[in-house]
């Protein structure tokens, strides 16, 4: 018998097991760039401690080449044991090389990073290796999170569209709008803070958080949508800056501006005045200047984080100054030469603007009864929401932050609260400042009211939008590079970036998307698309926090304590509701795009286990289901076969084949429509400490083989002194509760007599007895080499030789075979064995009634024992019907028994086999041989053309020779090409009742 019978790990019993050296403990390789690495001088045997102390530590210079291969580890270990170099260490018992210090913590972190299931739990190992990490300036909370968030939030919408929103929706609905969107971003910020403070965070921002919480498929799909949202948002900001510039400097236009004449501007349902002329920049001017500005911003982004950090204050300070100038102008209005619409802060104006005035507008946003666009609250929601979508700007740069767990919550929350308060205050101020006509027709009302000059606001608008565009063009490439570095989608490999380097290829791709959207040139067409992508990302962050908070796994310990799963759930629902309120069409399109990416990642993506929340949910669901099943017996209606597939207990297969190729096909035949679980087990003979690594390697190989054969199951490899002992451990301990395997499946040992493997009978009988004792059913397959696959359709009959009560297992197996394409054209025949002829008709009627009640269609044939006495029909000319077969079996058994008796007499001990005392009853041996011979002849007579034969397995007689039992089984199965020998257990698996 092979050692373990498992590919690559087995050997023949004739070979003496080679003694292996004791495994040496391995330690982390000391890197040459580790600073302050101390090499303790080895203390020679017999030397004093003082001498060792005088020698002192030797400091290794960085860059010294250190050999750390296995031979060096073995030598160092031997040196410790022989020379006692660590003999005086207080922690020698724990097996550490040196005392616990900060270097030990570095090793712990390094080992966790290497042991992660993904190639990069945030970093791509294949990229980082061989490329020294560049020194990168780390950012604090102010410059790394607060400033980017503020720049993204205070964008074009506030300056150009916010006064118009107040005029269209009225003061009270504008307050509801701002509070509604602010609640969504606030709850998302709470969820973001909780997840970001639950451990170290790598590059990728929200993608990293969602991917590690909801899995790589969801993370990549939402991450790519969020990347597109950032790239398109950059185009929106660029267009806003260009539009403002052309309004402020009309002489810079290359093409003639578009002029819109509105005959009657309707305000509060009445015409407000005469014809109004509205001038808007030409589309081609927007395209030309937009492309130029995008290219200039890309040059800044190519300069890296250092240049961006230097440029960012230059963009933000004028923005804050311009907002201050707007507030000053509001409080001192109206000034001389002010517009006729500006009334100054007035309660009367506030009352007039309190209610909404939704109406039709033209493409320029001017009220027009013949306009093509009708506005309502939902439409305003889609227009305004991009003004609050900058809360992820700081987390997008998580790889560049000094302390992500402190900076992201504080910076993002302060930016969210401050801007929301500013928006709420602005609603009151603008509503009390100007008439509704001015709010709806003057797009740059903020500039008109600003002190001391509109030029301040023009500069603020341009710089704010350029700053927001710069942040978008900075965060989007890093997000795409983080997705590519995770190595989930091979198609994104072009966008990978080395650790510490700039994602130049991703920046070029982002610029291409941004320029493509700039060419569209319509700001109101771009904003709904951005809104959907950002809301999808926010919903993903909230769902991630909801799942992690609800499951409350031991690893869920966020430093940010102000969170609850109900808040995250409300935030996620708010995001979904806002998406459908804005536009169900855009919502369906965005969800369809995310679903397509999810499907593509699941098909083409590389598998990665990031410990996501779904795995924890599956685990807790499995525990709940297991507890709900209890320890009671499973009702026959709920009984599922859980086969324990015993791989390669005997038989020689190629070393690279972990189990018989057809075992997986047979396991699939035992499950209806793939429902159920199979457990593939194998045993490696030997000592556990010596063969543990071999078992792990074999288990991985077997798992891969199961997946290759498309069989739903798990693999288990154990190490035991022998196959019998190993199987006994498996049959007692495998499984949990009612999810324990209930059927043991193995091949019939057809080679035992051919190769004279005399130890197989004892193992075979031991396995069957263990199954009977453990109340497990047994299915032994002969003819596995000829078992059909799913493409080989069979025609004929499935014959059952029902001899003993087995709980209906044989009947159920035959019905399961019929559910497979290979056997669906077959018919079932049930052969019942009767003792007397008088019982035949009664037995046939009972079996037919029983099968009818079981909803099973089968032909019933009764065979009596007396018919065995007649000479068999020899028309087939089979050699099995010749008495020579019977005499050969008798001769082999007599020879074997005589050898056992001679050994017992020679050693003066009782008759023993396999270490157990046995009793030889030659009359029973003759009787059992004859029974098997006649049963085999009956099977050949009636089922010679059967596709599969199922027959009851006789239990091994107590204190009987295993060799004799093996001879009985050989007589039973000989010349039958494909047979299943089935032993049921003391439990019904079929029921008559509904």
Curated annotation (Swiss-Prot):
Location in the cell: Membrane
Name under which the protein is recorded: Cation-chloride cotransporter 2
GO MF annotations, alphabetized: chloride:monoatomic cation symporter activity
Pfam families per UniProt: AA_permease, SLC12
Lineage: Eukaryota, Viridiplantae, Streptophyta, Embryophyta, Tracheophyta
Organism for this UniProt entry: Oryza sativa subsp. japonica
Keyword Ion transport in record: yes
Gene3D superfamilies: Amino acid/polyamine transporter I
Any one GO CC term of the record: membrane
Membrane topology: Multi-pass membrane protein
Annotated region (Disordered), positions in chain: 1-28
Residues bearing attached sugar chains per UniProt: 268, 274, 337, 353, 370
Predominant cellular place of this UniProt entry's protein: membrane
Function: Probable cation/chloride cotransporter.
Spans traversing the lipid bilayer: 140-160, 175-195, 222-242, 288-308, 312-332, 373-393, 413-433, 449-469, 506-526, 530-552, 559-579, 586-606
Signal peptide: none
UniProt record, GO biological process: potassium ion transport
InterPro entries: AA-permease/SLC12A_dom, SLC12_C, SLC12A_fam
Residue ranges, Extracellular side: 161-174, 243-287, 333-372, 434-448, 527-529, 580-585
Highest taxon of the lineage: Eukaryota
Family recorded in the similarity comment: Belongs to the SLC12A transporter family.
